[in-house]
Amino acid sequence: MKIICAHQKHEDGTPHADWLQARTGRITASRIGDVMSYLKPTKAMIEARVKPEESQKRKDYRMEILCERLTAVPAEHFVSKPMKFGSEYEDDARREYELKMETMVDQTGFVLHTAFDYAGCSPDGLVGTEGAVQIKVPNTETHLGYLLGDVVPEEYKPQMYFEMDCCELAWSDFVSYDPRLPDPLKLFVKRLHYDDERVQLIAGEVLCFNDSVNAWIDMLRKRFGDFKLPAQIAAKVQSQDYDGLGISDEEIRAVDPAWQG
């Protein structure tokens, strides 16, 4: 596991400067859902095995990463009232999890992917040498939906799989916490186990996404003249091919039809 900064936040909850710098220009686990986001394919596209169009979320995230790599300035994100509430109670959720599971959760900073330095994750906590936690403090309606559904929500699985890949873990617990509910309903925990097929598919998508960002940088150079990336960014984003990642040609072509092997 390659941890490059020890803390995500200061005691007052504000982001740690080292953590922000570590993330800037890198593809992060919290945005893997955007990396994997495509428009729903038509029947004709499925029959012809044509890759679906990118969603606007994927396009927007590519532009965000491009801006960060050209400027070394982290993107600004709006923090809503519910998000502030969640941040305030995340430590409580972590403690409740520790009590229920009779274990300890270690906090960490930014962890690089095992195979490439231009991507990584910031786990909400590590559990021993094999596990992690993904903590959410949602509104009550959403939390009750998790309790009644009794499954790991699909929208968080890509992030959790990628965190397991980065940290070389066997499992990750999805944790939802709502301090407003009666005690038996406050905490929901559901475990997601490592799935090699899903993990390698996501790794392939991350490679393709990074290549597309680099393609835009190359296009700007060709149109407007050569330039260098900021020094603190250049070391993070060296191009990487698919070799050594344990991904088969078939898996790569599923996300990158142009791949020739």
Functional labels for PLM-detected ranges:
Residues 1-261:
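Accessory terminal regions of nucleic-acid processing enzymes
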